[in-house]
Structure formats: structure tokens, C-alpha cells
Amino acid sequence: MPSQKIRIRLKAFDHKLLDQSVGEIVDTAKRTGARVAGPIPLPTVINKYCVLRGPHVDKKSREQFEIRTHKRLIDILDPTQQTVDALMKLDLSAGVDVEIKL
């Protein structure tokens, strides 16, 4: 796999958990001899939900909730077979969504 690139995109609601997972991936890739570009922070998506506080009347009384989705992008350039094997065996946290493109 000499001229390929692995693009890893991570999403999580907790940025500390996300940064910890990114660190593990970068350390694993560098340890096996691949070049790493990133982590690149992508824009945070903020979903806001507005709900009525009371069950019956008072439309003016509302409450807002938000969910922030933090994202990071990592490019692994010139991956070796050991890099791919190490990334497959890597155990990340349950709160992190990982998308891998070759």
C-alpha cells in the first residue's frame, strides 16, 4: 500500500473523549511508521431544541437545549500493513463515532 491514504473522521458529543481517541490513533500511526496529517478540527455542529416549559399555556415560557457535535479529521499518509493492523486492533471509547475511508 505505498501511495494510499487513510482518512479517519471522528465525531463525539464530548470533546475531551474525542481528543483522547485522536491521540491514541495518532500515537498508533506514528509508532508503526506512517506519516500523520492532523488532527484537523472541523466545525462544531450545534443542534438547538426549544420546548415549552408548561404543559398547558404560557407559550412565552420556553426552555432551550443544545447538543454539540465535535468533529476531527486525521489523514494517515503512506500507511504500512502494520499501521492497518494496529488501527484495526485499537479499542476506542464507546462515545466516539469513527468513519474510515481508504
Swiss-Prot record:
| PROSITE patterns, sorted | RIBOSOMAL_S10
| Keyword Ribosomal protein on entry | yes
Q: Which Pfam families match?
A: Ribosomal_S10
Q: Does the keyword Ribonucleoprotein apply?
A: yes
A Gene Ontology molecular function term of the record? tRNA binding
- Assembly and oligomerization: Part of the 30S ribosomal subunit.
Matching NCBIfam families, A to Z?
A: PRK00596.1, rpsJ_bact
Q: What does this protein do?
A: Involved in the binding of tRNA to the ribosomes.
HAMAP family assigned to the protein according to its UniProt record, in alphabetical order: Ribosomal_uS10
What is the name listed in the Swiss-Prot or TrEMBL entry for this protein?
Small ribosomal subunit protein uS10
- The scientific name of the source species is Geobacter sulfurreducens (strain ATCC 51573 / DSM 12127 / PCA)
Query: What gene does the UniProt entry assign to this protein?
Result: rpsJ
